[in-house]
Amino acid sequence: MISLSGLLTLLGIPIRALILAVKFYTVGLPYRKYSNSLKQCLRLLVFRTAVSLSVFDAYYISFMSNDFVINKIVPLFHKSITSKLPGYGTRYDKNSFWLVKQPNREPDDPILIYIHGGGYFLQTQPDQMESVLSMYKLIKPDKQARLSILLLDYKLASYGYPFPTQMNQLHETYLNLVTNEGNTNIILMGDSAGGNLSLGYLQFLKKTQLENLVYPSKLVLISPWVKLQPALDVMVPGNSYYDNSERDMIAYSQFGDPKKVVHITGEGDLDSLQVCPGARPTQVENWNDIPTLKDPRFDVFVITGEDESFRDSILDWCQYALDVPLNTQYKYGNSNNQFDKEGYEYIRKNDPGLCHLRLYIEPWGIHDSCLFFENHLILKIKKQESDPKKSSLDVNHIDDKEFYGITRIVQFLNDTL
């Protein structure tokens, strides 16, 4: 049964929404990125509320299975898109669904495994699906024709499946693709907890040392949750947790409680890089011997937000694992929503011993904004496709400020697939 505090939290949403609306039209809100959009501010309120629930209370708002979301909810609103995707909604194995299953796949054709966020205790949301499908629709036709996409249907901690259940499920699907089928071009794309699982899986592969091991050829990390429990000393001015506590979807109080983290990780060791990629103390050599990160033939994309609580921990991880020193060279928080390549973009190509890298800090961006707050791009795509006189939308014609994350991920995939 849902706890009293959880019930009161959910029942209080309408009251908090009313207060938010009054503030929006009077004194203003701390959500800088969406200060001119009441709709987005209300959505942010709902997302903050969901993440604030205990792991067990989250069970009562995670009642929709991925099967239901993929095959009922998304087609209900976007049938014109899903009906044209080959293999959409069919199972690959017990742990995954195809979003796109290209016919006549070759072993070197790319297969992207999308690993959804939600703290390991919240289910995939239609918003995330809309953004992922928007990315696919904007990829160049010749690249699109070869790209297949899987959704990892991992079990939730709120249903009694703590970590490493999710790691084991990913490994089972990965082995099916690589060992049993011989696929050689696997991409991992994860947001938040999905980013955590993607990075932890690299450490898992490193430790297992399987024969003829195939590492992911590409990694797309969207606001990866690299440090599961914030340190006690982060709530000081100048730290992203403190500065963005009122701006972001994520707040210190949501994961500062050790009990909540234990309910997610089970008996997992928070000092293990498989569980907590941002565990400290860490060393550069912890991330050596992982081709995905250390070989220029591999590609990595990372995005975080200036107004994101996880920002500092993500940039700390980038320093140790990717040799990117932005966290020590720049101070964030004063971009005035203007993109400046210096400090907010880091691109590296063809450096010996290092992967091809694109790292972005979105001005005023918040946690997971490209999947939860850019999903309305799918409506523009549908409108364009409904007019037979118009050609398909090109990513270069999309507003790259409104759709900051999606446009850059698509450009990355267009250039690297």
Ranges and model annotations:
Residues 111-113, 150, 301:
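Conserved beta-strand elements of the Class I
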Residues 119, 154-158, 226, 366:
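Alpha/beta-hydrolase active-site loop signature
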Residues 1-101, 417:
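A glycine/proline-hinged amphipathic helix-loop "lid/cap" segment
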Residues 2-5, 115, 168, 179-186, ...:
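Alpha/beta hydrolase fold serine-hydrolase catalytic domain that processes acyl esters and thioesters
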Residues 190, 194-198:
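Gly/Ala-rich beta-loop-alpha elbow adjacent to hydrolase catalytic centers
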Residues 97, 150, 358-362:
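General small-molecule cofactor/ligand-binding pocket signal
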Residues 95, 99-144:
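Short, surface-exposed "cap/lid" segments of acyl-processing enzymes
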Residues 131, 145-185:
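Catalytic nucleophile-loop/oxyanion-hole region of alpha/beta-hydrolase
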